[in-house]
Amino acid sequence: MVGGAGYIGSHACLALREAGHEVVVYDNFSTGHRQATLGNACIDGDIEDSGKLKGIFKKYRVSAVMHFAGLLSVSESVSNPIAYYRANVEGTLSLLSAMVDVGIGVMVFSSTAAVYGKPDYSPMLEDHPTRPLNAYGESKLAIERAFPHYERAYGLKISNLRYFNASGADPKGRLGEAHDPETHLIPRAFEAVSGGRPLEIFGEDYPTPDGTCLRDFVHVTDLADAHVRVLRRLEDGGESGVYNVGTGHAYSVREVVEMIDRITGRRVPVKICPRRTGDPSSLVAASDRIQNELGWAPIHSNLQGIIESAWRWHQTGWHIGAAGDSR
């Protein structure tokens, strides 16, 4: 589990372990947290250290890789694209090199809906044109385009999961979202209602019903289940694939804020800001492929359930203690 100490990676580790897999976490802890590994074998290392990766692969007799490592802030990618190409492209090439040298043939890759850019239609299918609006999406698409060459040359099987808006927390309260600083909408709103700075809403003049961006929010537990199903398909001899992982339903930023108002019993203080460069007005998934091929379903991904699980997690205070462990 490369990057297995982060938000999505840690939930996927939990799902894999519950499905009977042995898990090894490899993370540099630049944004991940040691507490989130929940007792799994855990190695501190960088994805660009191909030699160290090979040693770990051999020591633990690794049979498959899930790759969550990398940078993911849209706004930061606009101001610092070098870092994004280095982490997301060069880092992944280093990982692939180690896999090829050791003979590991299966990988599940953490991609993003940002590879699509401005939608021509909605919900978007996997064959929608890819025209990223920012370096984050471009860096993910660049490495996606490399995978078929590695598959043909080295016999690898690599499936890409294009996430939409991962959100929520483990329903049993074992894990949740803990970024430092926090940039995602729902936990940022929780910070705002808990006395932090107001929530910034970037743009209220989009061509949407209430002027704010529309997003497809998928519960992180459903997202973790998608990884387990895709891995099982590859290990059973199935073909590589590209899969959208979302619900097919969009909520606006204002709708999310209003739901948070209701669930927390507090009003989220907001500040309206100009649009951010690289933000499309709407991103909604058509996830028919993963549902039909693998039997996946977003069973936890209703907005109320997402926010309730995330709010319970926020109230534990774990995210505060974890902030000091993120470096």
Regions inferred by a protein language model and the residue ranges of each:
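N-terminal Rossmann-like NAD(P)+-binding domain of SDR-like oxidoreductases, especially those catalyzing
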Residues: 1-169
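Glycine-centered small-residue hotspots that permit tight backbone geometry or close packing
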Residues: 4, 32-34, 45, 75, ...
